């Protein structure tokens, strides 16, 4: 499996994307996941934001990353597609990201729904809106060979029955699942059972632990975790993560495992990386 990490880890440290590339090089990590910004942004322009902007030249970015020995596992264009603004803001955002990803050598784009039931839409109306949006997105993504992943993060995607319908919105090998160990847990689901049901759809994985205090305060109330402040392996979700890795192994998954946690400039994500590497070795899972 391919170890990756989400640059959200360094939001609070006000790092740039290149700072994140340097961290990856220093820690022998060769894949990276980040958010995408559409249009100028002052934090990004000043170098205080560890993500990429779509006005940056993708071929130049690809070369810079190669100099660090790093490539994209996925870019994150996860503006919620489930609400009234999904078609007018989310769809153009994803469509703009597709050719950029192709030129930058990024094979996947993450998408998702909103955290809560959308206002002014019934569940069925929202599902109809999303189906049209994903059909439009996949029509373009297929031409570029870019995989569109549905990330488990919101009201619909953490509901297994709704997710099953979403994964069948479009009959395409380019529509897949970004499984998230932390968001399934915080939503009140069992991550292990959830993964067993959908393991055949998994195209990218977020590895995220949950602190005891967050679990006590928010489990079954929230559907997603913005940033986990718990090192992977030190929270109440660690045993579930280990079992999920076994399921992925036994089903032939060899794709990215993207670490998601608060980095605090390094210490938290460093500990997380060590735990994931050790656990993969203990489970006889080859790693890159």
Segments (PLM) and residue ranges:
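Flexible loop residues that form catalytic
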Residues: 37, 80, 114, 210, ...
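Glycine-rich, proline-tolerant flexible connector loops at the mouths of alpha/beta enzymes
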Residues: 33-60, 114-121
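Active-site acidic/histidine proton-transfer and metal-coordination neighborhood
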Residues: 19, 25, 58-60, 64-74, ...
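Residue-level recognition of beta-strand->loop/alpha-helix junctions
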Residues: 9, 35-36, 76, 152
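Conserved beta-strand positions in the central sheet of alpha/beta enzyme cores
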Residues: 33, 74-76, 110, 149, ...
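Short low-complexity, flexible loop/linker segments enriched in glycine and/or proline
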Residues: 46-50, 88-90, 124-126, 164-166, ...
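The substrate-binding groove and active-site-proximal loops of carbohydrate-active enzymes
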Residues: 9, 48-52, 79-88, 230-235
């Amino acid at each position: 499996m391919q170890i990756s990490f989400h640059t959200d880890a360094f939001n609070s440290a006000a790092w740039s994307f290149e700072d994140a590339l340097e961290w990856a090089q220093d820690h022998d990590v060769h894949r990276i996941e980040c958010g995408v910004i559409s249009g100028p942004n002052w934090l990004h322009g000043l170098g205080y934001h560890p993500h990429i902007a779509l006005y940056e030249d993708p071929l130049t970015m690809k070369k810079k990353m190669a100099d660090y020995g790093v490539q994209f596992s996925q870019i994150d264009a996860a503006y919620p597609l489930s609400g009234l603004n999904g078609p007018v803001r989310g769809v153009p955002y994803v469509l703009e990201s597709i050719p950029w990803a192709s030129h930058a050598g990024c094979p996947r784009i993450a998408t998702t729904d909103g955290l809560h039931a959308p206002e002014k839409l019934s569940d069925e109306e929202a599902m109809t809106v999303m189906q049209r949006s994903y059909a439009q997105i996949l029509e373009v993504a297929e031409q570029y060979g870019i995989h569109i992943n549905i990330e488990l993060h919101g009201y619909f995607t953490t509901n297994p029955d709704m997710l099953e319908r979403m994964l069948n919105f479009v009959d395409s090998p380019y529509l897949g699942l970004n499984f998230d160990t932390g968001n399934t847990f915080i939503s009140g689901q069992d991550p292990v059972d959830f993964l067993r049901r959908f393991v055949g759809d998994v195209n990218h994985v977020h590895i995220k632990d949950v602190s005891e205090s967050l679990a006590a305060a928010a489990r079954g109330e929230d559907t997603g975790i913005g940033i986990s402040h718990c090192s992977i392996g030190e929270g109440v979700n660690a045993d579930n993560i280990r079992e999920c890795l076994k399921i992925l192994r036994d089903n032939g998954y060899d794709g990215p495992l993207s670490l998601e946690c608060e980095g605090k400039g390094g210490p938290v994500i460093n500990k997380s990386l060590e735990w994931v590497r050790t656990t993969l070795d203990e489970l006889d899972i080859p790693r890159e």
